[in-house]
């Protein structure tokens, strides 16, 4: 499986699993990123940090480390 960090701009993927523990995982889930949710990758900064995505109709910027914890398909 690949992570959200590996997804190219303009692609829509589905969240399959969240890695991480405790507060980090909770923060990602509080942003609306949960299993089964479609995520559209809008932009990736030149060095890969941050990644700009659209989730549930709103836009988010995720750190590279957070994007690596989100397994997608």
Task: Name each model-derived stretch.
Residues 1-73:
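Compact, glycine-rich, soluble single-domain proteins
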